[in-house]
Regions:
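Short, acidic loop-to-helix structural element flanking the phosphoryl-transfer center
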Residues: 69, 78-110, 121, 149, ...
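Alpha-helical elements of Rossmann-like donor-binding domains used by nucleotide-donor carbohydrate transfer enzymes
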Residues: 26-30, 48, 62, 66, ...
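A metal-dependent, Asp-based hydrolase signature
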Residues: 51-81
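Short, surface-exposed acidic
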Residues: 35-46, 72-82, 204-208
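Asp-based, Mg2+/Mn2+-dependent phosphohydrolase catalytic module
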Residues: 2-7, 12, 116-117, 121-208
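Active-site neighborhood of HAD-like aspartate-dependent phosphohydrolases
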Residues: 2-45, 182
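Short beta-strand segments
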Residues: 20, 110-114
């Protein structure tokens, strides 16, 4: 068990860890099916412009103008956005695990996530993530995206913590590897049980 230096801070991805992904390829495919869109064309347009949206340089309406509403549609923008938002669902066990560890170990919790502003704000408010997370280092706020190392450096600066005192949980192996390269302890999230066990190995056990 790691006892020194002790972990004082958790960095967490949101999509894939605390909540379902906000707008991944499966959701986009579902949107194309529901609204009768050409998925291949939609996906090509998505990949050409989505980074700009996630980096906070384009609004959700601007993104949708480029990807969906560049021509007349039989459905409204609000109907499409309602579908997007409705896809977000929580992973209650993970949220409560982090809440419990925060309370019992006095941890600081920071979200380090790639997501556009409107989806971020909706998800934070809808699932009351502010009750668990102290800092939101989202790509749309800081204008960097993982795996850019500066994303993690900004998170370290905002949290005022040294890398060796941070454990980072993400479901993307590459993102964890980049964080490890900066001296941050990384956990590749594949499910509740394995992540809880990995945290216990760092001295962060949840007392019943």
């Amino acid at each position: 068990m790691t006892t020194s230096p002790s972990i004082t801070t958790l960095f967490l991805d949101i999509g894939g860890v605390l909540l379902t992904n906000g707008w991944d390829h499966n959701i986009r495919k579902g949107a194309a099916d529901k609204f009768g869109l050409d998925y291949e064309e939609m996906d090509e347009r998505h990949h050409l412009t989505f980074d700009t949206y996630e980096e906070g340089k384009l609004s959700l309406d601007g993104y949708l103008n480029r990807v969906v509403f560049y021509q007349e549609r039989s459905f409204s923008r609000e109907e499409f956005k309602a579908f997007m938002y409705a896809q977000s669902q929580p992973f209650p066990e993970m949220i409560e695990l982090i809440r419990g560890l925060k309370s019992q170990h006095g941890l600081e919790i920071a979200a380090v996530s790639n997501e556009g502003r409107e989806l971020t704000m909706y998800r934070v408010q809808q699932f009351n993530l502010g009750s668990v997370i102290d800092f939101f280092i989202s790509s749309c706020f800081v204008h960097y995206r993982k795996p850019d190392e500066d994303m993690y450096r900004i998170a370290l600066d905002i949290a005022q913590v040294s890398p060796e005192r941070v454990a980072y949980i993400d479901d993307r192996a590459m993102f964890v590897e980049v964080a490890r390269g900066l001296g941050i302890e990384g956990i590749i999230h594949t499910g509740y049980d394995t992540t809880r066990t990995a945290l216990e190995g760092l001295g962060l056990s949840l007392k019943n």
